[in-house]
């Protein structure tokens, strides 16, 4: 009757026009329905405008909906719709909006608003629906206007019963019956409508009751009833908008109001309802239109009906969980807006009475009962899938698509068996599929490859896969899997051939059925599958079959196995190609204890380090009785084995975890403990020699097959580590692995028992494991290196993420930072980082070093040997020197062959000490390393960066939470930890810290970054880790780190100039110099803290200057660096300062103080003496930061300059890790040095010394101020100045000596 004001009123005769807008439903409905006659014009008006408006303005006026709701108040249809829309909208919207809408409804009862609302409603529905599927489908209907739907709607809505009969029905429950009539018809599609109706009624009862007179209520009731019927009748035929519009056209008022308002209000209600809301809106509109006619002059009769309907609606809504419904009436009023929110009126009040959303049908039938809560959703779903099923229960289209989030609360029917996607659920393989029986992918019904190919499944009745006779479908799946496996096998064969060409004889691949795809033991799966499984695991799920085994490895086996552990799988795969990488991964994997502490169950990285893993893995399994890799857990392996083909994924998760062999090494012990059943550590280690045998035995036992080349291929595929351990394992394992000591000695230096290479933070057991693993890896490395040469590249590519940190170093200079950061995060999140750090330092580092040491292979090996015992022990206790040298060597080797000699030199000094334990293995490894060196230089680069990086990282990230209290461990991961603390506290520091994580810096500038980073990471972290103890270790490690750092710097310098020269040149070029502004931030905040810290930095600087000039020779240089490294400033400055200063002096001081070899001391004084003068000195100014602008630069410069340098040491390093890539390795040191010269002597002193402590404090301050976390240079400077006082205050409470690293 009242055409929406905004609605262009088409002539009443414009029935046809409405059809045009919503041709589907509109065309016939208007003429058809009695209501259509009067309503048609309005409906048409609304229809035409509504479709446009709705589509056009759906989103336009989110609040218009509210207005519309008000409108709806005027016209019951309108309020209804608005409420619905609101409800729907408010589904997403908040109660506030509901209130808004109510107010607006009350304020505005214009049809235009209704139209807008409906438009918005639709839009919101779209928004909502897209997200919530409910609304979305409605929208599509709206936009599409399916003729049938609309036609149906029209007819239904137009059905005479609507206005007259329903008026009465609604009051009494009879309405449900009429409604049911329609409902049954509509219910499918209109179930939601009914909900909406109910909501609307409920809302209307309250809102509209208030707003609308009884008359309105009667009309509204009629409209609602009709609407319901129409909805039900059209059963989705509503054609969304058209329907509401078209056959809703029947009420004149419905037309204008129902349409405009109905649309608006109803739309709103519908909006509240959900996807069906569009339909509901339309239906509502139409109903409203129907009511529209009577709406204006709603009689008491109508009112009663309406109120009854409202009550029912409310009940249904409430019962339905008006929450879902969102208060359909409410929507318009805003009351209905919330699903459950409604004033409680529509849904809450009434809905509660009714059953629940499940009652949608009934509610629909019942009048509006159903229309209430559930229905809105039902409709939402229905709309899309409203087409058919039954009155209120249309099959939920979203459920069919697997996207229905309503679950049991969905108003649409989920009673349909969805055909499973003919694909194995990769999560099921792992034993963890959250969707359980609801998973669209195949679980236990997937054919067991092992059983169907060999006729025998080791898992027997416990197999995760189906042993039922093959059907056409399952046979097709099996054939496809086997074909994939065969393809993978072909790839494996190629890989094996390539390896053989390289002089690497991979172990024979296990027979197809062997254990390539052991069924993963579900939860244990991740751990259970080990090398043996690791391979199978690596192999795709399908690899289990004979042909598949090879393919799985290359194609997916590694990946699937590693799905959880991509790095691992990469490594494993790479291991297959590059065992060293796998070994690295293995080493990287934290020890079982570590993993446990970290909660990282990442055998993955461990797994990837298959070589070792396989050894241990195989070894224990051998003892265990090959069939079950001990690592895999007997049950695990067997399970995995059989199903592995299908469970490849399970294996993959398990693979990583499963590759206990590898994990066993580093993290494997825990894994191993499973498999070997021996102590995780020692048990695992001893098995390592057996591992290869075990592999053979395992495969033989498993499949009763001998270790065939296929096995090796699989092993390679699955775990290159296996291959590594296999051959290298046989030779190396027996030699060193056989000896516990040799394991510790020869084993990965970092990981071996000696734990010398192992981070001190590691528990003794873990350390022993780490050492053993390292040794084993070393032993395996000869072979592994060969494999690694080829496989390392692959692994690096595959390893990307986890291996990325080191592979990036080699391959990607700049992007490596990103990858490193990414990998660091990954590692941090999943034990791999810790293990990587550890491994890199010890185990990983060893294989890599050996591999990467090629240039300084023996040095690297000795270092590695040293790393596990001497270097690691010394390094952990004294010396990142060995670790640094190791990392630096690999890095140097990797980053710069030129630098490698230096690295070797440094390494050899370190190597001798470190190589004590590894002496013998190094010899073997040297050969292997040499072989690998040429090809594996890349690997060394990866390992080396990983080495120190990993060590610190593992410690930092993995053990950061575990060993944060441990100074030593903190330092190692202090950098990583610093990252977090620094992120939390000083971002600038984190930048520097990032530098320490050489990965980023290294990758951007592998050589310099690795050196500085490693030196800082390995040495400084150690120094940091043990501020006190670090002095000793730093002394040892300091010299070594000096060499390493120097060598790294020199490498960079080789590019830039001499060590010292690079420092100076580095500074200017280094972004740090550019970033100097960061320091100002530090400087400013540091001003207050700088004063206090300045004193400390001063002393630290004094040593640092000394170290700086001496650079290589002066551990004292560490003092300034130590403050940096320690970030404690005072704490490590004294004792740790010496060590740190070596590293810092080397990386930071050389670059910084190369200008004044002896200026370091002078700058130290300057730093203490001239905070302002220290401007040049990033650090000095950082501490005193009197001149934030320049100092910041200096500080940043230094942080970047001295990646390992004071600033760069930890916080700045971290910062630099991001920025460092810009400076690049050489640039950073050069920048450091260069900046000081420009700045003058004072800057240098300040730079190296104060900035670290100061930076730590300052940066912390600044970051807190929010200066600019990583980049203190920019906003930090300003913020530093602005927040200098607050930062000072903040940091006054902070112990400058308490570095974030050591927190």
From Swiss-Prot:
PROSITE patterns per record: ZF_C3H1
Gene3D superfamilies: Zinc finger, CCCH-type (4.10.1000.10)
SUPFAM superfamilies, A to Z: CCCH zinc finger
Cell location: Chromosome
Keyword set, alphabetical order: Chromosome, Coiled coil, Metal-binding, Methylation, Phosphoprotein, Repeat, RNA-binding, Transcription, Transcription regulation, Transcription termination, Zinc, Zinc-finger
Disulfides per UniProt: none
UniProt feature, compositional bias: Gly residues: 252-274, 1129-1139
The keyword Transcription is annotated on this UniProt entry: yes
UniProt feature, compositional bias: Pro residues: 1-33, 507-529, 539-558, 605-624, 659-673, 1235-1245
Composition bias type Acidic residues, residue spans: 53-73, 135-144, 194-218, 278-304, 358-369, 486-496
Keyword Lipoprotein listed: no
Basic and acidic residues bias locations: 80-99, 219-235, 305-321, 377-388, 630-650, 717-739, 782-795, 860-875, 1067-1084
Bias kind Polar residues: ranges: 815-843, 1028-1038, 1053-1062, 1259-1268
Positions where Phosphothreonine occurs in the chain: 72, 75, 1106, 1118
Record family assignment: Belongs to the suppressor of sable family.
Role played: RNA-binding protein that suppresses transcription of long non-coding RNAs (lncRNAs). LncRNAs are defined as transcripts more than 200 nucleotides that are not translated into protein. Together with WDR82, part of a transcription termination checkpoint that promotes transcription termination of lncRNAs and their subsequent degradation by the exosome. The transcription termination checkpoint is activated by the inefficiently spliced first exon of lncRNAs.
Complexes and interactors: Interacts with WDR82.
Protein name: Zinc finger CCCH domain-containing protein 4
């Amino acid at each position: 009757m009242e055409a929406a004001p905004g609605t262009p009123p088409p002539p009443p005769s414009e029935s046809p026009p409405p059809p045009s807008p919503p041709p589907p439903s509109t065309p016939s409905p208007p003429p058809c329905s009695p209501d259509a006659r009067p309503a048609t014009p309005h409906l048409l008006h609304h229809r035409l405008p509504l479709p446009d408006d709705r589509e056009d303005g759906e989103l336009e006026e989110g609040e218009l909906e509210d207005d519309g709701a008000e409108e709806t108040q005027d016209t019951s249809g309108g309020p209804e719709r608005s409420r619905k829309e609101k409800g729907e909208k408010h589904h997403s919207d908040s109660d506030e909006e509901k209130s808004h809408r109510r107010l607006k409804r009350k304020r505005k009862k214009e049809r235009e608003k209704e139209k807008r609302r409906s438009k918005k409603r639709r839009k919101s529905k779209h928004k909502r629906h897209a997200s919530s599927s409910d609304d979305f489908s409605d929208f599509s209907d709206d936009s599409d206007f399916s003729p049938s739907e609309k036609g149906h709607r029209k007819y239904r809505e137009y059905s005479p019963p609507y206005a007259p009969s329903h008026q009465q029905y609604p009051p009494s429950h009879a309405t449900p019956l009429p409604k049911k009539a329609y409902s049954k018809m509509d219910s499918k599609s209109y179930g939601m409508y009914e909900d909406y109706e109910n909501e609307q009624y409920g809302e209307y009862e309250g809102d509209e009751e208030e707003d609308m007179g009884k008359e309105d209520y009667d009309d509204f009731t009629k409209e609602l009833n009709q609407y319901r019927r129409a909805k039900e009748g059209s059963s989705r035929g509503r054609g969304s908008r058209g329907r509401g519009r078209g056959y809703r056209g029947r009420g004149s008022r419905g037309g204008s109001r129902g349409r405009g308002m109905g649309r608006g209000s109803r739309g709103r209600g519908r909006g509240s309802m959900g996807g069906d809301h569009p339909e509901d809106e339309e239906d509502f509109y139409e109903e409203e239109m129907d009511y529209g006619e009577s709406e204006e002059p709603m009689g008491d009769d109508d009112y009663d009906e309406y109120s009854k309907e409202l009550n029912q609606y409310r009940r249904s809504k409430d019962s339905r969980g008006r929450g879902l419904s969102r208060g359909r009436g409410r929507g318009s009023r805003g009351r209905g807006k919330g699903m459950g929110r409604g004033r409680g009126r529509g849904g809450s009040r009434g809905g509660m009475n009714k059953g629940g959303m499940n009652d949608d049908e009934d509610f629909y039938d019942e009048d509006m009962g159903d229309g209430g809560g559930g229905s809105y959703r039902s409709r939402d779903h229905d709309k899309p899938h409203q087409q058919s099923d039954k009155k209120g229960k249309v099959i939920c289209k979203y459920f069919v698509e697997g996207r229905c989030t309503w679950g049991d609360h969905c108003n649409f029917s989920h009673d349909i068996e969805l055909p499973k996607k003919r694909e194995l659920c990769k999560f099921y393989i792992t034993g963890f599929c959250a969707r359980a029986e609801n998973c669209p992918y195949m679980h236990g019904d997937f054919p067991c490859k092992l059983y169907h190919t060999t006729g025998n499944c080791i898992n027997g009745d416990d197999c995760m896969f189906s042993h039922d006779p093959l059907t056409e479908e399952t046979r097709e799946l099996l054939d496809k899997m086997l074909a994939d496996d065969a393809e993978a096998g072909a790839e494996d064969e190629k890989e094996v051939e390539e390896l053989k060409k390289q002089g690497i004889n991979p172990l024979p691949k296990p027979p197809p059925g062997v254990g390539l795809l052991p069924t993963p033991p579900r939860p244990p799966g991740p751990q259970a599958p080990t090398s043996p499984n690791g391979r199978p695991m690596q192999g795709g799920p399908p690899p289990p079959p004979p042909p598949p085994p090879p393919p799985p490895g290359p194609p997916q086996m590694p990946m699937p196995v590693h799905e959880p552990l991509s790095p691992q799988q990469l490594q494993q795969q790479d291991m297959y190609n590059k065992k060293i990488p796998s070994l690295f991964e293995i080493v990287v994997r934290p020890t079982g204890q570590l993993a446990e502490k970290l909660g990282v169950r990442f055998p993955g990285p461990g797994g990837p380090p298959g070589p070792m893993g396989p050894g241990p893995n195989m070894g224990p399994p051998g003892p265990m009785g090959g069939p079950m890799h001990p690592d895999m857990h007997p049950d695990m392996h067997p399970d995995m084995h059989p199903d592995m083909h299908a469970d490849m994924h399970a294996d993959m998760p398990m693979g990583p975890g499963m590759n206990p062999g590898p994990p066993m090494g580093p993290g494997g012990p825990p894994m191993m403990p499973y498999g070997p059943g021996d102590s995780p550590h020692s048990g695992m280690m001893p098995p390592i020699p057996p591992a290869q045998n075990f592999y053979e035995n395992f495969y033989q036992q498993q499949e009763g097959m001998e270790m065939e080349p296929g096995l090796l291929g699989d092993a390679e595929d699955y775990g290159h580590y296996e291959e590594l351990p296999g051959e290298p394992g046989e030779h190396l394992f027996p030699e060193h692995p056989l000896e516990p000591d040799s394991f510790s000695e020869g084993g990965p230096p970092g990981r071996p028992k000696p734990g010398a290479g192992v981070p001190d933070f590691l528990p003794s057991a873990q350390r022993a494991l780490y050492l053993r693993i390292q040794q084993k890896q070393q032993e395996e490395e000869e072979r592994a290196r060969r494999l690694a040469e080829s496989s390392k590249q692959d692994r690096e590519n595959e390893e990307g993420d986890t291996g990325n940190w080191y592979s990036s170093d080699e391959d990607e200079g700049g992007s490596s930072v990103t990858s490193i950061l990414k990998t660091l995060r990954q590692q941090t999140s999943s034990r791999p980082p810790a293990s990587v750090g550890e491994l890199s330092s010890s185990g990983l580092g060893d294989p890599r070093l050996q591999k990467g040491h090629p240039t300084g292979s023996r040095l690297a090996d000795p270092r590695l040997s040293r790393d596990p015992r001497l270097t690691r022990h010394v390094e952990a206790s004294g010396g990142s020197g060995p670790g640094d040298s190791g990392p630096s060597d690999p890095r140097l080797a990797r980053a710069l062959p030129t630098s490698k000699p230096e690295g070797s030199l440094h390494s050899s000094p370190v190597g001798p000490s470190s190589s004590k334990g590894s002496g013998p293995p190094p010899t073997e490894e040297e050969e292997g390393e040499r072989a690998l060196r040429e090809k594996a230089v890349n690997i060394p680069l990866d390992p080396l960066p990983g080495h120190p990086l990993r060590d610190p990282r593992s410690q930092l990230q993995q053990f950061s939470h575990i060993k944060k209290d441990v100074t030593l461990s903190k330092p190692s991961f202090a950098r990583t930890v610093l990252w977090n603390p620094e992120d939390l506290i000083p971002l600038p520091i984190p930048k520097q810290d990032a530098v320490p994580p050489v990965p980023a810096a290294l990758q951007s500038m592998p050589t310099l970054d690795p050196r500085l980073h490693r030196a800082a990471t390995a040495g400084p972290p150690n120094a940091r880790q043990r501020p006190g103890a670090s002095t000793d270790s730093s002394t040892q490690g300091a010299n070594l780190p000096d060499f390493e750092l120097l060598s790294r710097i020199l490498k960079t310098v080789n590019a830039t100039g001499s060590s010292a020269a690079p420092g100076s040149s580095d500074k200017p070029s280094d972004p740090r110099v550019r970033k100097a502004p960061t320091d100002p931030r530090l400087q400013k905040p540091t001003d207050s803290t700088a004063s206090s810290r300045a004193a400390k930095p001063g002393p630290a600087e004094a040593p640092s200057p000394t170290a700086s000039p001496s650079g290589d020779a002066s551990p004292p240089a560490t003092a300034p660096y130590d403050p940096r490294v320690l970030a404690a400033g005072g704490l490590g400055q004294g004792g740790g300062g010496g060590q740190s200063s070596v590293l810092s002096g080397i990386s930071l001081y050389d670059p910084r103080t190369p200008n004044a070899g002896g200026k370091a001391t002078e700058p130290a004084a300057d730093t203490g003496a001239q905070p302002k003068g220290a401007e040049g000195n990033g650090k000095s100014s950082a501490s005193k930061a009197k001149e934030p602008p320049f100092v910041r630069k200096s500080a940043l410069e230094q942080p970047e300059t001295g990646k390992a340098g004071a600033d760069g040491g930890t916080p700045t390093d971290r910062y630099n890790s991001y920025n460092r890539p810009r400076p690049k390795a050489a640039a950073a040191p050069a920048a450091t040095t260069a900046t000081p010269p420009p700045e003058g002597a004072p800057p240098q002193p300040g730079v190296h010394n104060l900035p670290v402590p100061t930076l730590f404090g300052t940066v912390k301050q600044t970051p807190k101020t929010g200066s600019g976390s990583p980049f203190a240079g920019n906003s930090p400077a300003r913020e530093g100045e602005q927040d200098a006082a607050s930062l000072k205050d903040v940091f006054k409470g902070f112990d400058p000596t308490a570095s974030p690293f050591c927190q």
